Amino acid sequence: MKKILFLAGFALLTSCGSVQNTKKQPFTWEGANLYFLLTDRFQNGDKSNDINFERTEKAAVLRGFEGGDLRGIIQKIDSNYFSDLGINAIWMTPLVEQIHDATDEGTGKTYGFHGYWAKDWTELDPNFGTKAD
């Protein structure tokens, strides 16, 4: 008798399924998990665009372009990097064309790798990618 009750209870428990709520929740900024990324430092997805505008002067340590670009960001999105972290909003540094020459701020030559030394607000800096990216 105990065996029958055990089997009946086991069958009942294993046959019960849970209902999944598949309704997608709307995005709200209040619930956002924001990821800030410095585009040039994030992921180099296209090594062919690493040097543009003859930006060949040796920069001080960590003061030059390192190669991160739109292609690298797209690769990480496609690999679910952000969604695996629970990220649903990305804040990127500006991608507009930066000044072409290096500047010495007292720490050695520095390029506008950070995106905040805009030269042309209407063009993408080719170090970061193209409009096709």
Language-model region placement:
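Sec-dependent signal peptide recognition
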Residues: K2-L7
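Short, linear, compositionally biased motifs with a strong N-terminal bias
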Residues: F10-A11
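N-terminal structural segment of carbohydrate-active enzymes
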Residues: V19-D133
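C-terminal motif of bacterial Sec signal peptides marking the signal peptidase cleavage site
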Residues: T14-S15
